[in-house]
């Protein structure tokens, strides 16, 4: 039986009617995303002077088309499939054929032994993360993540009743700051949340980094007497540059829950399609997937559309042409370091994270926007002040035209 109670509400009189509102979410409405502020400024300014005069590096929206295979499969499904089946409800865990296809793809590519019972289809990585966290945490538990990190981790974790602890960044490498991490471990820690390749730094955690992390977690599991889950946020898994060591994290630690999205790898952010894959060696692996289906009853999540699940089966072993991202990275890294900017070279994604030229990165980014129409976002949002993020999922032409603006920005401070 599900207990019912009223939490965090107040009674208001408005037009002589009693209205119940939730104070927690009401307070959130006044805390808008800084990234969104810059994005909105770019659109407003672009409406005045023309978007071609705005150099918008604020948002991580893929700039390359979906593989033709996906488009062809969508057309084929619409032309040949029974429309009733095509537009019917999906089972709560996802279509069996899609879940099995995902498992087969992971097994083939990474030498794993997933079955469909280890796969839960989701509305991209955000939904996968929210479900994974609810599977393994409760009120009073603790989740650890590492700066710089995706700001939405805060509501994902606090929505479970758990506490999010953020380990300060090692800004010399942006690999895991193990000294601070080990100080923060305690019996309340139920999960570690990582993102590699990383938004916003573009850094990829090496095999050595993940192996060391796994060894520490195994030792602490024995000490504390309970599993510590590694929740791996992997929407950029396929965007890794030449020669970069990029391990499949689930291969290196048993209690790993992989949260994946097709938004970046095959340019499907609007379709909201991804999955949660529980390592078969994970404690209660199959049970966690069944639990995710029950959690959906509380979150209102009811699987991605059936047609999108069917179509994505055709691109499980494909990507969009991602080469433009490495081209853009190479140009920006070469030119910005020539100018004098300091940064750790990205190993993947379509982000880089240079040091700002003043400690107040927020002021630095607003000056770039208002004086140069150059839209970049401050690192404070990622709990890494003194840095700024460049999202280079744009045309190479825009990257090349923006270099003189980055040089002008540098000269404003040096």
For the regions a language model picked out, list residue spans one by one.
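PLP-dependent enzyme catalytic core of the Aspartate aminotransferase-like
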Residues: 16-18, 104, 108, 182, ...
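Conserved PLP-binding catalytic core of the aspartate aminotransferase-like
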Residues: 65, 325-330, 339-371, 388, ...
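Single conserved hydrophobic/aromatic residue that forms the stacking wall/gate
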Residues: 1-15
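Conserved core segment of the aminotransferase class I/II
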Residues: 254-326, 330-334, 410
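N-terminal small-domain helix-loop-helix segment of the aminotransferase-like
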Residues: 21, 26-124, 131, 315-319, ...
